[in-house]
Structure formats: C-alpha cells, structure tokens
C-alpha cells in the first residue's frame, strides 16, 4: 500500500478513511499522540515512544484501551503493509466520541494510527532557526494534540525563511516548535532539563546516553538566549527526522 490509516480496528488508505464528527478531537483536541520513524520494518525506539505515549495518557487521564505490547505489534504490522523501507509512524488516542460537553464522556477512547513512506535525508546541511516567545501552557512534557502555539511559531519560522522556531521563555531557551534544542560550549553538552517546560525527547535521551558513553560532559539546565547565540554548536534533535546532526545553524532574532 502507498500508505495506511487505522481507526478503531478499521484500516484503509488515509485519503479514504473517515472519522466520526463527534470525536472529541474536533471540539477540544482532547487526546495525546506520539510519532517516530520505521527503518526496514523496525519502529525506531518503539519502547521509548510507547512509554512516553502511555505517560501522556496517564497525565491526561485517558485510558487508551490497548496495552503496550499490543500497540507495538499493531504499529509493526501496519508498517509492514506500506511500500518502502523508511516510514513516518504516527499514532494518537482521543477521549472517545460524544456530544460536545467539557467533562469526560462515558465510553471508549478512539485509537488512530497512520503510516506513510518517507525519503531518507542523509546529507548534512545547515539550517536556520528563528527565536520566538514561548507562550505555551505549562504541560509541555505531555504530548497533547493542542499544538496551536507550535503551529503558529512554525509558520512564522517558515515565513522568515527558517526551518525551525526556538522558544524563549523569560530569557531562557526551552525547545523548538517540533524538536528539542541543545548547545555545545567548550566541550560541554548543555540541554534544558526534562521538566514540564519541554517534551522529554527520545532523540534527546539517546544523545545524552551517547555523550555519557563518549565521555562528553552533560549539563541538564536552562540556558539563556545569549548562551545559544554564543554556542560553539547548536544541535536540533527529533525522532521524526533521519539525518546527520547539523554542525552549523544560523539564528535569527
């Protein structure tokens, strides 16, 4: 298949599937998600992403109606049905289908999955970053579907000719619109600590582990916009891109 979608047990091409009008995602963005890549049929860091997904579910008090192992098998099975060897894998759960009312409805959650082929980008290239004010809410560690501030920031970056937007909160760098950001200065890897102001990125986790294996000092702490501008290197990381780390970024105020 050229792509595949899944909704509560029904599968088909993404352009053919339909979801109920009363799915709570329509009214409230009431759900959580996660995403990664698959390479040669293997969902990359699947356990890490699934653990984070279930943590998001717990934070938002959503029962996904599926277990970890069952979800991992489902993702792997769907990947196997799509053409190509490199895929974008996305899944989300919403808090069911019901007439619009703020309190939680009775009934089961809705599980969505989509898998699409992607092209590998293995060529290193510099990217440009735009700094923007971080006005998001204080639950950035939960991967909810409420992404409007990220969407607007990403659009402003695009309009400025940049590939990513960097959030600045009270003078400190938090993360980007859809990735984590880190700096290298005097041989030290510096990254914002994993608290409620950033998403605990899976790529970030494995970069930190690699630094520890290689003997590179790691500081998990807030760093300022000035430190960002003065860094020896800026590293942007995300699980849904597969490329060499870029050793040079241009930053725009």
Show the residue positions of the predicted features.
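Ordered, amphipathic secondary-structure segments that act as subunit-interaction surfaces
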Residues: 84-91
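Phosphate/pyrophosphate-binding loops at sites that engage ATP/ADP/AMP, CoA/4′-phosphopantetheine
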Residues: 79-82
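Helix-start/capping segments and mature chain N-termini
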Residues: 1-77, 94, 99-246, 251
């Amino acid at each position: 298949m050229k792509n595949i979608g899944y909704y509560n047990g029904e599968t088909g091409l993404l352009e053919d599937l339909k979801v109920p009008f009363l799915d709570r995602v329509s009214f409230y963005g009431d759900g959580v998600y996660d995403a990664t890549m698959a390479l040669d049929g293997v969902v990359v860091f699947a356990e890490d992403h699934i653990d984070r997904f279930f943590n998001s579910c717990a934070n938002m008090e959503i029962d996904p109606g599926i277990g970890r192992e069952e979800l991992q098998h489902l993702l792997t099975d769907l990947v196997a049905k799509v053409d190509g060897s490199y895929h974008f894998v996305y899944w989300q759960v919403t808090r069911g289908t019901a007439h619009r009312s703020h309190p939680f409805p009775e009934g089961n959650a809705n599980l969505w999955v989509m898998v699409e082929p992607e092209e590998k980008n293995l060529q290193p290239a510099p990217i440009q970053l735009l700094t923007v004010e971080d006005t998001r809410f204080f639950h950035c560690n939960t991967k909810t579907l409420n992404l409007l501030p990220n969407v607007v920031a990403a659009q402003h970056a695009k309009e400025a000719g940049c590939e990513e937007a960097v959030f600045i909160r009270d003078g400190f760098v938090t993360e980007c619109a859809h990735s984590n950001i880190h700096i290298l200065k005097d041989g030290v890897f510096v990254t914002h600590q994993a608290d409620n102001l950033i998403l605990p990125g899976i790529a970030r986790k494995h970069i930190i582990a690699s630094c520890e294996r290689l003997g590179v000092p790691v500081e998990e702490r807030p760093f300022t916009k000035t430190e960002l501008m003065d860094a020896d290197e800026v590293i942007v990381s995300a699980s849904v891109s597969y490329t060499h780390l870029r050793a040079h970024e241009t930053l725009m105020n």
